[in-house]
Each structure stands twice: as C-alpha cells, then as structure tokens.
Amino acid sequence: MASGNCTTPTTFILSGLTDNPGLQMPLFMVFLAIYTITLLTNLGLIALISVDLHLQTPMYIFLQNLSFTDAAYSTVITPKMLATFLEERKTISYIGCILQYFSFVLLTVTESLLLAVMAYDRYVAICKPLLYPSIMTKAVCWRLVKGLYSLAFLNSLVHTSGLLKLSFCSSNVVNHFFCDNSPLFQISSSSTTLNELLVFIFGSLFAMSSIITILISYVFIILTVVRIRSKDGKYKAFSTCTSHLMAVSLFHGTVIFMYLRPVKLFSLDTDKIASLFYTVVIPMLNPLIYSWRNKEVKDALRRVIATNVWIH
C-alpha cells in the first residue's frame, strides 16, 4: 500500500458530475427523486413477492433478487453522489472508497449473472413446460442464487485485493462521482497493468458467459414459440420474455460499452454518463419494466390492496 516515501491517502476527492455551482442543487433534486423512486419500487416489489403466494415461483424468486441487487446498487452509489452536490470539498475516505469499489464490482457481476439465470429459467418454462416444476424447484433456484452471489463475491475480492496493492502518491483526485477502476488506475503511481488485465479477463468472462447463456436460451425459445399454432400462445410466451430482454439490452449494452470497448474510444467524461445510466437510472427502470405490463404483478398488488382495505 505504500512504497518509498509514499503514504496511502486517508481520503480521495471525487470530481463529481459537474463543478458548475448553478447545477448542483437542480441535479441534487433530480437524483434524490430518482433514488427515492428506485428504493420505493424495488423494495415494494420485494415485499409484494414475499407476501403474495401466487408469486412464489422461480421467475419471481430471481426477480426479487434482481430488485434487491438494484436497490443495493443504487444505495452504494447514489447517497455519496448526492452528498457531493451539497459539499464544497467532495471527499470520500480511503476505506469508504475501497468498500464502495468492492460493493460496486460485486453487484455488477451479480446483476449480470442474475440476468443469465433468468434467461435460463424462461428457456425451461417455455421449451420444457412439463419438466419445469421438477427442474426449477425452489431448492435449485436458491442454489443458483447462492452460487452466483459466491462467484460475484470472489471476483470482487480479487479486484479489490489488487486495488489495495496500488499506491497513490501523485494525486488523490478521482475524476468520477464514485470509486470506479478506470479513474483510480489513472491516478495510481504504481503499475496497473495486472489490474487492467484482470478487469478485462474477468469482465469478459462474466459478461460473455452471461450474454452467451442469454442468446442460446432465446434461440431455443424463439424456435419453440414459432411452432406454437395459437396467436394467444405465442403472445403469452413472448410477453414473459419482453421485459427481460429490455433489462438485458439496457444493462449489458452499457457495460460492454464501458469496459470492453477499444482503448481509443476511452473517455472518462463519457464514462461518467454511461456509469450514471447503469448505476442510477437502470436500477430505477428495472422494477418498472418488469411490472408495467406484468398481469401477475398487477393482480398481486390488487390482492394486497384489497386485503388491507378489507382488514381496515
């Protein structure tokens, strides 16, 4: 953590989204509203799935964990970002930065793997409907969830351990609104070659394995659906996948742009906008995407409201 006369900084200074004083309060209000909506919708969906027996199915177990991941994702990033709009000196402690980085990497991989597992669940439900209850049992679902959390944890541990070995002698100003790897590597006075290689290898491994699983699942889903004769059957099959495909496109599209694009296209300012999208905006959109046209979720919400009204 230290080399020669270099001492590890006790704090980092975050540059934030903008240094324009006139934009600080408007941006604070906008992102406070987004964060509030994110928490209310994701925690609301978690609670709804927990209390409604009709939603105790594999698809909603995974959706519940996706909502938890999104709520945690937003909470790791947004509160500190909101604070930077109100503080003249936008600081984060060294330990706070490391913890934020660890949590961010953990949740990014968790979401990626969850989207892959959800695609596999849809594949089994549509392509093997008779075997679905025996294949996707609750025990299997929770083993998959625990497995992907474990993989994400180990991956985050590797990257965070590498970050702890870096020295920051020349600067402690992070050109970002949170502690991400690219701006931290940029100000490191140590060689970051190994760190960058690990980010690329593990990032590619998890992203591509998730994307390949999703693509293969949907190839089989499409081949099965086109053989369904009734229009209602086709519509029902596709409608269960539309929300998931939207979530996959938003998340993986942004992550691929962020971490797997050519070096010549790299720009920290561009990264800020892309990071803002998948750390703040997507966690707000996901519960809306999954519940907006979902009849089962709407029916469950009506049942819960009706029960509470009847009790009172």
Swiss-Prot record:
Residues 50-57, 121-139, 227-239, 293-312 are cytoplasmic. The chain crosses the membrane at residues 27-49, 58-79, 101-120, 140-164, 206-226, 240-260, 272-292. GO terms for molecular function: G protein-coupled receptor activity; odorant binding; olfactory receptor activity. It comes from the Eukaryota. It is found in: Cell membrane. Signal peptide: none annotated. Keywords: Cell membrane, Disulfide bond, G-protein coupled receptor, Glycoprotein, Membrane, Olfaction, Receptor, Sensory transduction, Transducer, Transmembrane, Transmembrane helix. Pfam families: 7tm_4. SUPFAM superfamilies: Family A G protein-coupled receptor-like (SSF81321). Glycans are attached at N5. Disulfide bonds join C97-C179. InterPro entries: GPCR_Rhodpsn, GPCR_Rhodpsn_7TM, Olfact_rcpt. The keyword Cell membrane applies. Odorant receptor. Belongs to the G-protein coupled receptor 1 family. This is Olfactory receptor-like protein COR4. It comes from Gallus gallus. The lineage of its organism: Eukaryota, Metazoa, Chordata, Craniata, Vertebrata. The gene is COR4.
